[in-house]
Amino acid sequence: MDFRTGDNITAAQLKNGVFIWEVRNPLSFKIMQHRQIRPGSQMYVTQIRIMFNHGLKKALLMHKCFLDLTLYHYLTATSGMILSTFSDQLFRYLNNLGVISIGNVLKGASHILYEKLHHVEDVSLTHNVQYKLY
């Protein structure tokens, strides 16, 4: 849903993309939170934010685009290693497609988290997407 207007994102907006070689550094990643569910537990909660850069937002006619993924997992690696692996795999997936769009980023993230990383139990997605009104 577009947070500015409250309208649902259309399929055309979801599939609207730009070639990956037209935008430098199209995505950036940030660890928002990494903690155990409760002390002594082996399950961790890691929240990763995927941010679209200015050039990509401009090409896709967006004002703001944040995708927050909350991972519930049993991975024992550090949060930086999880982020590095996730971002490398996502860029590899997007390079193979050749086009970056919201839909492709979401498909790539779900492919990596459910197919490649085997210790991920559950993923929840929240987003903040705002399209330009003019």
From Swiss-Prot:
Pfam families membership: Gemini_AL3
Function field: Increases viral DNA accumulation. Enhances infectivity and symptom expression.
Family recorded in the similarity comment: Belongs to the geminiviridae replication enhancer protein family.
Organism annotation: Mungbean yellow mosaic virus (strain Vigna) (MYMV)
Alphabetized UniProt keyword annotations: Host-virus interaction
ATP-binding as UniProt keyword: no
Entry annotated with the keyword Aminoacyl-tRNA synthetase: no
Subunit (UniProt): Homooligomer. Interacts with the replication-associated protein (REP). Interacts with host proliferating cell nuclear antigen (PCNA). Interacts with host retinoblastoma-related protein 1 (RBR1), and may thereby deregulate the host cell cycle. Oligomerization and interaction with PCNA are necessary for optimal replication enhancement.
Biological process annotations from GO: viral process
Name of this chain's protein: Replication enhancer protein
Database matches in InterPro entries: Gemini_AL3 (IPR000657)
